[in-house]
């Protein structure tokens, strides 16, 4: 006996069996083992080998036994004696069988059949088998270690389980019918949940098994039929029928899923259907020929159900009766699919026919017409009809009987309310009306223009409207060109030109109007009879640091009443000065504009509302970029220019050089025979200021500036901001008419009543005449600087106009927030674009506008600035919340925190940056954008080495080198040049100095170099060493 010990797992390898199978054999032979690592004697091993050989010959049945015993503990040798009591093990076997069917249909079919055999035998033993074993089936879906060992039908004839073969075939037969004929598989389902899983269980294995099974299925399976007889969701099953039936059985797992779904739909449908079914059996026969493929097979299995239908002989008739109403019920959803005109009449006719239980082919033919509208909606309606058939038929009978006169139709529409939901009827009629309207609209199509003028970027929708084509047509054209666009996306001018070429429309690029150009004429025809002289509005313009504000301060200090405490605080950018000219007291209103390049829009606005432009040029600095820009603004606005050459008291001042430079821009001094007045002044010393003021008044007289003070005020918003105490505050320049406290004012989209007015000296005033600049309180919102304002007599009219303008503004803001196609399409397709979210709060609207304009100048090809909010006013807790939600940075320019905002920012961890110099703000944001850019790899040279000798080493070679310049570093990148050409690029793998490994070798030393992938060294080769370093990119590179 004890010739030697053998471990179970070694024996399993030798016999090419699983450990579990071997343990099962040990159980059968009463060999006591605990696990696969237990040892047995050689003689026991021999007996196992013999048993394994028998297994190999009859592997089907052995597998069955193995499956049965695989869940038993191997330590009990008495397990094999208990084997003949299968009923005790039934549930365990079922658990093994069901999941295998669901998952591995091909490989596990035989095992499933074996399980079925055992179920069948259990059925033979117990009189009412379906319920006891149906309940364990449902929880078994997820479990299943399935073994993918292919086995064929050879199992069935080999073991004493031969008599069980027939029940197996029977069990598979219903399954096949359940899958292939959804209408029938659903029929048996209405009632008890315990029985639903059975058809699902058996369904999948029948597909992969060989054809023989089909024959055995057909031959008869009364035993298992009852389970299939239940019918539940007819509608879904027949919907499945509409799709190709052959495709569904082909998929094992997917086919089982629909069966489960079919078990769920409304069970309430079953009862009314049964009522109609019994008498409708003959009509069902009439419909039956539509499925000629397997009539006999279907009839046989469904014939036997003991679902309370007595007699197997009546099975076929009962079956067809059950199917016939199915079909009728199924077809019920289709009538709404007919042409829209006769829907109601046809539905009622169909319901009458169901009531009479007569399946008429004519009606059926009508129903086959294709769907026009939403079939799901109609089907739901008809589901409700099916539940209420008895009541609805009585109502509709009297109406549906007459032929089809229009009167009857209208009557039926009224009384057939319970049958077809009125809401959907209304929807459909409204659809019809809409369709008719659309047709009428399309008939009045605009002709496509031959030429269009474009000033800037446009959305696809706007372009489609301009070119009189469908927006989808433009999207299609661009898609064919490789550009994916949406209807609301902005297209730039080159893209618009491309679309125009495709549509054969000439696209002209109209030059955008200069911002400084005067758009609206403030004086109307009715004012001509009432015009009076008004003070001139003078804008001081020039380059930054050329002394504009100093000049203004100097004029004010000399001309403002000396009694004012501490001089005048400049509340607003516009103020007036009283001077005596020709013995009369006259006024001049000055506007101060910033000189920094960011404030272009402000300068343009100043030029637009002004009458005379004073151009300040420093005598020591000459004409600068903003000087040129100011000249162009004034010329675009068509206002006369008076040049003040400032800083003549400084050393190095060259007034004549300034005059010379100005001639290049069309400004020639009167002294030199030109028309431009040029006055040399010193703002600090106050030299020649009176001369400058006199010249301004002289030019004003020539211009004959006039306005009508007896009308409602009109003018322009110079500046606006949000004050925490006063609310929205706007600085208005009145250009015509007179403004009173209490007037209804509309500025842009901001509407309000003038509550108070404050002049430039801080005094409250009740009346402001032409050319006056005042601060106005009482507006509902902060208007944009540069908006025109107007006073209305009718408040309702003003409100309506304000609402309309607000909508337009909102739309334009949305369009601006959208990125244009060219800047984004390529990057968006390659990868995610990086964005910097900003919330910008400034002291006044003009500052905010200037900052936004500057930020737009920063290149944004790879990183985008996304302005979530730009407004004038304090930084509030609302801003902090918005920043926290969107991950934005808050930029504050010359503004403060509202109470509680700073603490909220600290708690939320929001980054708030405060600035009072615009240069610094722009630099910081540009730096933040550069930080978002991916750093680029740049080659940094290390040194140059010459090969002096080559030493063969093994299969390769080592180069003896001399470092001529720089250094060599191990693992650096090298480039080998021979006769000026690069012959190899790679990594320096080995570096030695005097037989020792070296990390680096400096210039003037010799060393040995080895490269794994290159051995073709030659004396005189030059080795260039370099390394790749990351370098921060700048936005200039992304242009």
Swiss-Prot record:
<dbReference type="GO" id="GO:0005829">
    <property type="term" value="C:cytosol"/>
</dbReference>
<dbReference type="InterPro" id="IPR006847">
    <property type="entry name" value="IF2_N"/>
</dbReference>
<feature type="region of interest" description="G4">
    <location>
        <begin position="646"/>
        <end position="649"/>
    </location>
</feature>
<feature type="region of interest" description="G3">
    <location>
        <begin position="592"/>
        <end position="595"/>
    </location>
</feature>
<feature type="domain" description="tr-type G">
    <location>
        <begin position="533"/>
        <end position="706"/>
    </location>
</feature>
<feature type="compositionally biased region" description="Polar residues">
    <location>
        <begin position="103"/>
        <end position="125"/>
    </location>
</feature>
<feature type="compositionally biased region" description="Basic and acidic residues">
    <location>
        <begin position="178"/>
        <end position="197"/>
    </location>
</feature>
<feature type="compositionally biased region" description="Basic and acidic residues">
    <location>
        <begin position="226"/>
        <end position="243"/>
    </location>
</feature>
<dbReference type="InterPro" id="IPR023115">
    <property type="entry name" value="TIF_IF2_dom3"/>
</dbReference>
<keyword id="KW-0342">GTP-binding</keyword>
<dbReference type="InterPro" id="IPR027417">
    <property type="entry name" value="P-loop_NTPase"/>
</dbReference>
<dbReference type="Pfam" id="PF22042">
    <property type="entry name" value="EF-G_D2"/>
</dbReference>
<feature type="binding site">
    <location>
        <begin position="646"/>
        <end position="649"/>
    </location>
    <ligand>
        <name>GTP</name>
    </ligand>
</feature>
<feature type="region of interest" description="G2">
    <location>
        <begin position="567"/>
        <end position="571"/>
    </location>
</feature>
<keyword id="KW-0547">Nucleotide-binding</keyword>
<keyword id="KW-0396">Initiation factor</keyword>
<feature type="compositionally biased region" description="Low complexity">
    <location>
        <begin position="157"/>
        <end position="176"/>
    </location>
</feature>
<feature type="binding site">
    <location>
        <begin position="542"/>
        <end position="549"/>
    </location>
    <ligand>
        <name>GTP</name>
    </ligand>
</feature>
<feature type="binding site">
    <location>
        <begin position="592"/>
        <end position="596"/>
    </location>
    <ligand>
        <name>GTP</name>
    </ligand>
</feature>
<feature type="region of interest" description="G5">
    <location>
        <begin position="682"/>
        <end position="684"/>
    </location>
</feature>
<keyword id="KW-0648">Protein biosynthesis</keyword>
<comment type="function">
    <text>One of the essential components for the initiation of protein synthesis. Protects formylmethionyl-tRNA from spontaneous hydrolysis and promotes its binding to the 30S ribosomal subunits. Also involved in the hydrolysis of GTP during the formation of the 70S ribosomal complex.</text>
</comment>
<dbReference type="GO" id="GO:0005525">
    <property type="term" value="F:GTP binding"/>
</dbReference>
<dbReference type="InterPro" id="IPR015760">
    <property type="entry name" value="TIF_IF2"/>
</dbReference>
<dbReference type="InterPro" id="IPR000795">
    <property type="entry name" value="T_Tr_GTP-bd_dom"/>
</dbReference>
<dbReference type="InterPro" id="IPR053905">
    <property type="entry name" value="EF-G-like_DII"/>
</dbReference>
<keyword id="KW-0963">Cytoplasm</keyword>
<feature type="region of interest" description="Disordered">
    <location>
        <begin position="39"/>
        <end position="347"/>
    </location>
</feature>
<dbReference type="InterPro" id="IPR000178">
    <property type="entry name" value="TF_IF2_bacterial-like"/>
</dbReference>
<feature type="compositionally biased region" description="Low complexity">
    <location>
        <begin position="408"/>
        <end position="423"/>
    </location>
</feature>
<comment type="similarity">
    <text>Belongs to the TRAFAC class translation factor GTPase superfamily. Classic translation factor GTPase family. IF-2 subfamily.</text>
</comment>
<dbReference type="InterPro" id="IPR036925">
    <property type="entry name" value="TIF_IF2_dom3_sf"/>
</dbReference>
<dbReference type="Pfam" id="PF11987">
    <property type="entry name" value="IF-2"/>
</dbReference>
<dbReference type="GO" id="GO:0003743">
    <property type="term" value="F:translation initiation factor activity"/>
</dbReference>
<dbReference type="InterPro" id="IPR044145">
    <property type="entry name" value="IF2_II"/>
</dbReference>
<dbReference type="InterPro" id="IPR005225">
    <property type="entry name" value="Small_GTP-bd"/>
</dbReference>
<dbReference type="GO" id="GO:0003924">
    <property type="term" value="F:GTPase activity"/>
</dbReference>
<dbReference type="Pfam" id="PF04760">
    <property type="entry name" value="IF2_N"/>
</dbReference>
<feature type="region of interest" description="G1">
    <location>
        <begin position="542"/>
        <end position="549"/>
    </location>
</feature>
<protein>
    <recommendedName>
        <fullName>Translation initiation factor IF-2</fullName>
    </recommendedName>
</protein>
<feature type="region of interest" description="Disordered">
    <location>
        <begin position="400"/>
        <end position="452"/>
    </location>
</feature>
<dbReference type="Pfam" id="PF00009">
    <property type="entry name" value="GTP_EFTU"/>
</dbReference>
């Amino acid at each position: 006996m004890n010739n030697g010990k053998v471990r179970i797992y070694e024996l399993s390898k030798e016999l090419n069996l699983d450990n579990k199978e071997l343990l099962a054999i040990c159980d059968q032979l009463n060999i006591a083992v605990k696990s696969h690592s237990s040892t047995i004697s050689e003689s026991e091993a021999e007996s196992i080998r013999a048993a394994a050989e028998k297994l190999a010959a009859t592997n089907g049945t052995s597998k069955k036994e193995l499956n049965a015993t695989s869940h038993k503990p191997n330590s009990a040798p008495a397990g094999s004696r208990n084997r003949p009591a299968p009923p005790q093990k039934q549930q365990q076997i079922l658990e093994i069988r069901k999941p295998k069917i669901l998952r591995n249909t091909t490989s596990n079919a035989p095992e499933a059949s074996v399980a079925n055999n055992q179920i069948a035998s259990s059925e033979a033993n117990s009189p009412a088998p379906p319920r006891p074993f149906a309940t364990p089936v449902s929880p078994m879906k997820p479990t299943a270690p399935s073994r993918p060992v292919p086995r064929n039908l050879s199992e069935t004839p080999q073991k004493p389980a031969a008599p069980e073969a027939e029940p197996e075939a029977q069990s598979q037969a219903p399954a096949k019918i359940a899958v292939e004929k959804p209408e029938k598989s659903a029929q048996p389902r209405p009632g008890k949940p315990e029985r639903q899983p059975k058809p699902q269980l058996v369904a999948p294995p029948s597909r992969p098994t060989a054809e023989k099974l089909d024959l055995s299925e057909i031959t008869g399976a009364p035993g298992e039929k009852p389970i299939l007889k239940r019918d539940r969701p007819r509608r879904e099953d027949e919907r499945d029928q509409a799709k190709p039936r052959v495709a569904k059985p082909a998929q094992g797992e997917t086919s089982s899923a629909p069966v489960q779904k079919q078990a769920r739909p409304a069970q309430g449908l079953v009862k009314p259907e049964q009522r109609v079914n019994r008498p409708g059996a003959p009509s069902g026969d009439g419909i039956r020929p539509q499925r000629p493929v397997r009539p006999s097979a279907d009839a046989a299995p469904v014939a036997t159900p003991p679902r309370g239908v007595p007699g197997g002989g009546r099975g076929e008739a009962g079956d067809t009766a059950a199917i016939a109403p199915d079909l009728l019920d199924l077809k019920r959803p289709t009538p709404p699919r007919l042409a829209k005109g006769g829907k109601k009449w046809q539905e009622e006719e169909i319901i009458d026919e169901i009531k009479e239980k007569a399946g008429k082919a004519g009606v059926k033919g009508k129903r086959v017409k294709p769907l026009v509208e939403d079939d799901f909606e109609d089907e739901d309606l008809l589901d409700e009809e099916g539940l209420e058939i008895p009541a609805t038929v009585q109502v509709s009978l009297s109406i549906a009987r007459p032929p089809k006169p229009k009167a009857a139709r209208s009557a039926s529409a009224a009384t057939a309310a319970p049958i077809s939901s009125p809401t959907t009827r209304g929807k459909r009629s409204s659809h019809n009306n809409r369709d008719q309207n659309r047709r009428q609209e399309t008939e009045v199509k605009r002709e496509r223009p031959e030429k269009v003028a474009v000033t800037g970027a446009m959305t696809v929708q706007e372009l489609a409207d301009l070119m009189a084509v469908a927006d989808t047509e433009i999207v299609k054209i661009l898609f064919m060109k490789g550009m994916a666009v949406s209807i609301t996306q902005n297209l730039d001018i080159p893209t618009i030109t491309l679309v125009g070429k495709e549509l054969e429309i000439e696209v002209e690029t109209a030059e955008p109007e200069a911002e400084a150009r005067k758009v609206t004429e403030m004086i109307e025809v009715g004012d001509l009879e009432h015009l009076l002289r008004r003070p001139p509005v003078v804008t001081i313009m020039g380059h930054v640091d050329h002394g504009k504000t100093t000049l203004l301060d100097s004029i004010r200090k000399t001309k403002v009443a000396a009694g004012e405490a501490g001089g005048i605080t400049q509340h607003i950018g516009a103020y007036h000065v009283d001077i005596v000219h020709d013995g009369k007291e006259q006024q001049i209103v000055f506007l101060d504009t910033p000189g920094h390049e960011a404030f272009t829009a402000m300068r343009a606005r100043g030029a637009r509302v002004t009458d005379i432009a004073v151009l300040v040029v420093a005598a020591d600095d000459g004409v600068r970029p903003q000087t040129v820009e100011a000249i162009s603004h004034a010329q675009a606005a068509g206002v006369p220019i008076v040049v003040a050459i400032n800083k003549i008291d400084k050393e190095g001042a060259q007034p004549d050089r300034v005059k010379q430079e100005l001639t290049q821009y069309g400004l020639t001094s009167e002294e030199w025979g030109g028309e431009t007045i040029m006055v040399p002044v010193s703002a600090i010393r106050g030299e020649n200021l009176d001369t400058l003021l006199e010249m301004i008044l002289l030019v004003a007289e020539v211009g004959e500036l006039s306005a009508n003070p007896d009308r409602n005020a009109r003018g322009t918003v110079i500046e606006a901001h949000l004050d925490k105490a006063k609310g929205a505050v706007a600085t208005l320049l009145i250009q015509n008419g007179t403004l009173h406290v209490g007037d209804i004012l509309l500025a842009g989209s901001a509407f309000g009543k003038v509550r108070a007015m404050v002049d430039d000296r801080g005094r409250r005033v009740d009346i402001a005449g032409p050319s006056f600049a005042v601060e106005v309180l009482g507006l509902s919102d902060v208007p944009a600087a540069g908006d025109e304002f107007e006073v209305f007599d009718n408040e309702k009219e003003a409100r309506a106009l304000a609402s309309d303008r607000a909508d337009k503004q909102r739309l334009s803001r949305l369009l601006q927030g959208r990125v244009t196609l060219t800047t984004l399409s390529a990057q968006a397709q390659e990868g995610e674009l990086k964005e910097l979210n900003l919330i910008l709060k400034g002291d006044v609207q003009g500052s905010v506008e200037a900052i936004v304009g500057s930020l737009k100048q920063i290149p944004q090809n790879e990183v985008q600035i996304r302005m979530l909010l730009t407004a004038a006013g304090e930084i509030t807790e609302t801003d902090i919340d918005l920043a926290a939600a969107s991950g934005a940075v808050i930029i504050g320019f010359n503004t403060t925190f509202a109470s509680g905002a700073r603490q909220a920012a600290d708690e939320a961890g929001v980054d708030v940056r405060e600035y009072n110099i615009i240069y610094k703000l722009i630099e910081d944001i540009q730096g933040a954008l550069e930080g978002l850019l991916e750093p680029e790899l740049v080659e940094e040279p290390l040194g140059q080495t010459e090969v002096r000798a080559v030493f063969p080493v093994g299969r390769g070679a080592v180069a003896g080198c001399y470092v001529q310049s720089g250094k060599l570093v191990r693992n650096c990148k090298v480039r080998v040049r021979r006769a000026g050409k690069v012959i190899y690029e790679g990594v320096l793998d080995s570096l030695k100095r005097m037989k020792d490994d070296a990390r680096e070798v400096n210039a003037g030393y010799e060393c040995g170099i080895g490269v794994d992938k290159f051995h073709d060294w030659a004396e005189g080769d030059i080795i260039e060493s370099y390394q790749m370093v990351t370098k921060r990119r700048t936005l200039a590179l992304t242009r």
